[in-house]
Amino acid sequence: MGEPTIEDYYVEDRTFPPSEQFTAAALLSDTSHHEEAAADYEAFWARQARELLTWDEDFHTTLDWDLPFAQWFVGGKLNMSANCLDRHVEAGLGDRIAYFWEGEPGDTREITYADLLDEVCRFANVLTGLGLERGDRVAIYMPMIPELPVAMLACTRIGVAHSVVFEIGRAHV
């Protein structure tokens, strides 16, 4: 028997049940979501996507599955930056904490949805002013500072693909 090929890994039969501790802390206390998804997973995920996300254009096909390729929510268009920020501010949650940032000991910040949206829009305008537009690609080389998610969400907001490059470490000279 030779080495396995990629095709040998197309089917996964193992299951990985959550721990009791994880299950106890879950937001769902019954199995109704699981049962609904098991009965008709495409309808389940279509409903979840329409209820939980804001779509600029609705999708016409929930799943186009042609092994080993899958396309979810075919024909749909959304802006993930708007889904991460705008919808929460518009729902009156702008003063809620979007994320907590912790740097060096004692260096912390709480960033609200409204503040984050403001920063993201301002940086998206900077990127647009530099000539970046939908379909362009950028690499973001920044440390883990509060401005990193601002840069990422600003790129997402204007349709610029981005890759984050972290400095793993360097020798002290």
Range-by-range predicted roles:
Residues 159:
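Structured binding elements
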Residues 35-59, 76-98:
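A short N-terminal helical cap/helix-turn-helix that marks the beginning
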Residues 25-33, 66-77, 101-111:
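Acyl-group handling in specialized metabolite and lipid biosynthesis
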Residues 35, 81-82, 95, 99-153, ...:
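Conserved AMP-binding/adenylate-forming core of the ANL superfamily
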Residues 15-23, 50-78:
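Short, charged, surface-exposed hinge/linker loops at domain edges
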Residues 8-32:
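Short, contiguous pre-domain boundary segments
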